[in-house]
Amino acid sequence: MGGRLIDLGVRGAILAATMSAAVAAGQTHKEFRFNVGPKAGVSVNNPYGSISVKPSTGNVVLVNAVLFSDRVEIDNNVAGNRVELESHLLAGADAQSGRVDYEILVPADTSLSLHSSSGVLRAEKLHADVSLEGSGATVEVRDINNAHIHVKTLNGPVTITNVQDGHVEVDSLSGNVTLNSVTGPLVQVISTSGGINYLGDFGDHGDYRLTSHSGNIEAIVPDSTSADVSARSVRGEVHDDIPLQPKQHTSFVLKQGSAFWGTMGRAAVSSTVVLRTFNGKIHLRKRSAK
């Protein structure tokens, strides 16, 4: 009996390895190279699969793509200083057979437009405008400075990390949004039911607007933060763990437990922070000392 079980186990392992090899055999690797000038543009439309973009050296765009079957092709076009890539689905393609995973290297000053319905959209270490859009895609942006960042998702989570001097706009239906060390003249998040988490100091002289209809909003800030903060939840609760200098004149009634408005830090350099939700909770608290 024991020998038979071992034999079945060996057969199972061989079958799994065979199936894995068959899947891998159905994949195709393609590489593209495009020479571009300064401040080029790259757009990628990929219905199924991930897109990852990092900086390259020199004025060249390098594309490494993995196609998961022969039911999808890659169309490419160069128009002036702009490179356009599109995953072209053939008859019978579905989310698995039509999948393409892209790894792309671009000059750091290249503007991006990335679209995928699923997978991961990732852009990092650039200093140019970035637009990322996907229904269920996971969006990750990090280490981007002096740029406009536009993100639009339905239910995919969004994480933006270490962005300085950015114009950041995030529009999400139900995905959770996390901003970690994100500052700039404009930082705006609008969500219908997703939660919003901000970790950072709100910078200097910026305009920060975090709004969710039914999701919770949490802002965790250090002692050095200077900000004029107003928070209001129509049907939910608000909590403030940081002493604020109350505003003398406000545009709405400050009902205990559902709204607050005050200044923390140095008013002369403070950013304007607006936190709004209809029936979610809002929590402003101090970052724990490590």
Regions found by a protein language model. Give the residues of each.
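Intrinsically disordered, low-complexity terminal regions
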Residues: 1-290
